[in-house]
C-alpha cells in the first residue's frame, strides 16, 4: 500500500475503475438465467392488482399476497411496486437489484476506506464484485441485495457513532434499523446486538442524554414498527406451510458435541459465502477449515493488538451476531435449522468487512511492530494478500460466467408455445406455476384463450400424494369429464403426478428436460 501511495493516483480513478468493474460484472448475463419461482412470487406480490391472479393465487389484494404467500417483511415489495410502474420487463425487474448492489458497493467502499485506506477499499470492491453468491443475488430480483445494501450502510453509521456520539446519529441509527428489519427478518440478528452494544457504549461514555434518547427511540420503534410488523405480516406468514419461521423437526447437533457443532456451523456459513454450492466444494472443505481457523486466529491477534476502538467494537459485534444466530437457528426457530444458505445472507456484509479489516490490521500491526522480522514480513504479506484476492476473483469470475439457471420456465413456455401447447390440456405443478404464468402472460403472443386448457395447481399438499390420490385428485378437480388422451405436465422433475399417470398406462416424452421439465403424457 505504501508503494501505491507513492504513485499518487487520484482517488476518482482508482475508485471509478472499481465501480466500473462492478457494473460490468453486475450487468453481464443479467437475464441469461430465467426468472424463477421466488422472483415471480416477489413480482406478483409487488403489483397492485385487485382480484385473484389467474394461475397464481386466489388472494385478491397486494397486502393479502404479501401476508399469506410471502415469507418476508413488505419493504422490498413496496419498492418494487413503484419500480414496476416505470416499466415492466424481465430486464428492468432484474436491473433494480443491480442498482441496489451499486448503492451497497458505494457504502462498502466508504466503510473500508474509513477503517483501512482507499486502496484497500478499492481492492474490496473488486473482490466484492467477483464473489459468485453475491453477484448471483445482484442478478436476482429479490430482497436479499436490498438487505445487504442496507446493512452495509447500517455498519457505516455504526462506525460514525463509535467515532463520535451524537443524539442525531443515535436516532438515525434507530430509523435505519427499522428499515433493515422491514427488509428481512434475518436483519434482527444484526441490529439487536448492534443496538444493545451502542446503548452500553453511550452509558459508559457518559452520554446520558444520548442513552435515554436512544432507549426511547428503541421503544417507540418496537411499538410503532415492531408490533404492526408482527401482527400484519409475521403472524399471518407463520401459518404458511413453507414458512422459515420455525421448523417441526428434532434439534440436530453435529456429533452430539456442541463445540464441534458450533465450529461446523461457522464453516458451513463461510463455505457458502465463499463458494455457494460449488460441485467441488466437498473436495476442498478442508481448505475452508484452514481459512476459518486462520481468520479466527488473526481476529484474536488483531483484537489484542489494534489501537482502533472501532475495530474492536466491530469484532465484538460480530461475535454476538453469530452467537445469537447460532442459538436461534440450532433451536429450529429460523431458516429450518439449516446453516449455510441464503437465509444467512445478513452475515455476508458483516463478515466481508470484518475479513478485510482483519487482513489490513494484521499487516499494519506487523508494519508498526518494534521487531524487525515482523517489519520485513510486511511487504510479502501485502503482496500475498493481493495475489490471493486476485486468484479468488478469477475463480469468482469463472463461476459468474457459468451462471446457473435455477428453473428454466422460459424455455418451457417458449417450447410449449411453439408446439401449440395451448391446444393440449396442460397441468402446471405447484412450484412451477409462478414462473409459467409470468412467461405465459409476458409473451408477445399471449391471449386470454391460452388459459382454456391450462390448470395451475395451487394445492401444496398434493406434492406428497400417492398414485391413487393423484388420479382421484385429477379426476375430481381437474378433468371431471375424464382424463384426456394427451396431457402436458410442467414440473421441476419427474414428479409424483407424472408417475401416477404412468401407472395407469400413459407414456411419457420429455419435451424439455433442463432445470424445468415439460412432459407430454399420452395414452397408447
Give a label for each model feature:
Residues 10-367, 377-521:
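Membrane-proximal helix-loop-helix interfaces that form the catalytic/acceptor-binding platform
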Amino acid at each position: 500500500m505504501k508503494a501505491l501511495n507513492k504513485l499518487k493516483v487520484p482517488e476518482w480513478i482508482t475508485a471509478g475503475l472499481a465501480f466500473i468493474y462492478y457494473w460490468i460484472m453486475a450487468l453481464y448475463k443479467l437475464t441469461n438465467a430465467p426468472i424463477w419461482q421466488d422472483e415471480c412470487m416477489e413480482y406478483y406480490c409487488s403489483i397492485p392488482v385487485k382480484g385473484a391472479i389467474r394461475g397464481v393465487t386466489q388472494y385478491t389484494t397486494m397486502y393479502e399476497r404479501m401476508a399469506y404467500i410471502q415469507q418476508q417483511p413488505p419493504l422490498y415489495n413496496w419498492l418494487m411496486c413503484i419500480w414496476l410502474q416505470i416499466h415492466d420487463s424481465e430486464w428492468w425487474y432484474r436491473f433494480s437489484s443491480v442498482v441496489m448492489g451499486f448503492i451497497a458497493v458505494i457504502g462498502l467502499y466508504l466503510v473500508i476506506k474509513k477503517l483501512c485506506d482507499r486502496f484497500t477499499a478499492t481492492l474490496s470492491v473488486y473482490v466484492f464484485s467477483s464473489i459468485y453468491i453475491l453477484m448471483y443475488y445482484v442478478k436476482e430480483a429479490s430482497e436479499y441485495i436490498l438487505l445487504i445494501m442496507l446493512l452495509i450502510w447500517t455498519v457505516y453509521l455504526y462506525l460514525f457513532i463509535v467515532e463520535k456520539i451524537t443524539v442525531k446519529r443515535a436516532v438515525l441509527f434507530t430509523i435505519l434499523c427499522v428499515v433493515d428489519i422491514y427488509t428481512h427478518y434475518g436483519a434482527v440478528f444484526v441490529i439487536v446486538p448492534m443496538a444493545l452494544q451502542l446503548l452500553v457504549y453511550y452509558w459508559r461514555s457518559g452520554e446520558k442524554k444520548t442513552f435515554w434518547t436512544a432507549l426511547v427511540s428503541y421503544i417507540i420503534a418496537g411499538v410503532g414498527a415492531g408490533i404492526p410488523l408482527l401482527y400484519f405480516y409475521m403472524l399471518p406468514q407463520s401459518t404458511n406451510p413453507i414458512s422459515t419461521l420455525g421448523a417441526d423437526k428434532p434439534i440436530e447437533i453435529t456429533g452430539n458435541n456442541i463445540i464441534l457443532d458450533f465450529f461446523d456451523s461457522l464453516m458451513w456459513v463461510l463455505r457458502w459465502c465463499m463458494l455457494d454450492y460449488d460441485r467441488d466444494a466437498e473436495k476442498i472443505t478442508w481448505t475452508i477449515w484452514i481459512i476459518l481457523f486462520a481468520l479466527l486466529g488473526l481476529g484474536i491477534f488483531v483484537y489484542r493488538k489494534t489501537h482502533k476502538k472501532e475495530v474492536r467494537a466491530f469484532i465484538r459485534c460480530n461475535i454476538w451476531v453469530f452467537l445469537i444466530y447460532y442459538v436461534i437457528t440450532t433451536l429450529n426457530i429460523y431458516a429450518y435449522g439449516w446453516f449455510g444458505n441464503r437465509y444467512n445472507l445478513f452475515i455476508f456484509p458483516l463478515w466481508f468487512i470484518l475479513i478485510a479489516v482483519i487482513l489490513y490490521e494484521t499487516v499494519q500491526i506487523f508494519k508498526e511492530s518494534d521487531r524487525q522480522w515482523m517489519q520485513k514480513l510486511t511487504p510479502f504479506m501485502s503482496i500475498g494478500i493481493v495475489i490471493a484476492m486476485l486468484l479468488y476473483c478469477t475463480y469468482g469470475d469463472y463461476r459468474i460466467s457459468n451462471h446457473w439457471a435455477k428453473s428454466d420456465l422460459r424455455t418451457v413456455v417458449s417450447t410449449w408455445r411453439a408446439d401449440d401447447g395451448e391446444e393440449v390440456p396442460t397441468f402446471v405443478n405447484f412450484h412451477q406455476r409462478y414462473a409459467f404464468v409470468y412467461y405465459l402472460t409476458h409473451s408477445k403472443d399471449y391471449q386470454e384463450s391460452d388459459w382454456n386448457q391450462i390448470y395451475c395447481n395451487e394445492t401444496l399438499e398434493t406434492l406428497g400424494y400417492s398414485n391413487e390420490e393423484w388420479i382421484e385428485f385429477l379426476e375430481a378437480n381437474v378433468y371431471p369429464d375424464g382424463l384426456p388422451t394427451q396431457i402436458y405436465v410442467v414440473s421441476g422433475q419427474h414428479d409424483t403426478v407424472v408417475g401416477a399417470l404412468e401407472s395407469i398406462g400413459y407414456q411419457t416424452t420429455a419435451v424439455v428436460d433442463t432445470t424445468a421439465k415439460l412432459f407430454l403424457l399420452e395414452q397408447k
